[in-house]
């Protein structure tokens, strides 16, 4: 019987150099958010409750900006993720706008294809994502003049060309990525310094957290998104929210 136990990803240790450069990054983030709020006061920030999104939530709330903060409860979240919604609202004394899937559409999908259909093919997994994530997000953004995300270039190959401001062609509205040029340790330096609420799964080897069936812990040295849809090729590893 093998006694080998793989080492899992851990929250990075922050260096003094990274701490020293944080004030400039935080000031730039605040300026970017204020720019968006001035141009589009009713813009919506779509939070997945990831550490990147908690950083942006913290800045929005500290600055008391009028931006909407929306999130999706797909019906397949880990309990730890659901608990973070309540913790965030308590910490910042605000209400997140929580959007959920159409119950009948979600039930019909599972009746026809089964509860584990996402493992059967990329097509079925994307259909599940559409029902549980894309359609609710479309409802959330229906009247939004612009929206914001916590995406970063260094997260994955599919995000390597992100910019601060982009055009969401599918909705014909502006899309902003206010920490697009941050590195992973910049995010954790902010989270540590400002004490932002975090998902407990980060302490269990999960650097990237989605729905429970589609997320696993990541081994030390793996790409931080290796635990998302791990059974698929890296070229298909997006849910479609950010096309």
Regions found by a protein language model. Give the residues of each.
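Nucleotide-activated chemistry modules centered on ATP-dependent adenylation/adenylyltransferase
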Residues: 2-243
């Amino acid at each position: 019987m093998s006694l080998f136990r793989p080492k899992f990803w851990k929250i990075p240790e922050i260096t003094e150099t990274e701490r020293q450069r944080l004030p400039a990054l935080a000031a730039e983030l605040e300026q970017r958010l204020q720019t968006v709020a001035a141009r589009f006061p009713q813009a919506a920030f779509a939070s997945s409750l990831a550490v990147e999104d908690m950083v942006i939530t913290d800045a929005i709330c500290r600055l008391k900006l009028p931006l909407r903060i929306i999130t999706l409860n797909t019906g397949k979240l880990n309990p730890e993720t659901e608990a973070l919604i309540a913790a965030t609202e308590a910490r910042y004394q605000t209400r997140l706008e929580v959007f959920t899937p159409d119950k009948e559409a979600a039930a019909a999908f599972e009746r026809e294809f089964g509860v584990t259909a996402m493992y059967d093919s990329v097509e079925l997994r994307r259909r599940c994502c559409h029902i549980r994530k894309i359609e609710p997000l479309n409802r959330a953004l229906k009247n939004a003049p612009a929206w914001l995300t916590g995406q970063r270039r260094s997260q994955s190959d599919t995000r390597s060309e992100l910019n601060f401001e982009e055009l969401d062609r599918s909705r014909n509205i502006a899309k902003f990525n206010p920490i697009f040029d941050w590195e992973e340790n910049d995010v954790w330096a902010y989270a540590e310094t400002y004490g932002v609420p975090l998902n407990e799964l980060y302490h269990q080897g999960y650097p990237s957290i989605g729905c429970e069936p589609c997320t696993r812990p990541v081994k030390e040295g793996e790409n931080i998104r290796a635990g998302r849809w791990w059974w698929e090729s890296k070229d298909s590893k997006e849910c479609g929210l950010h096309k």
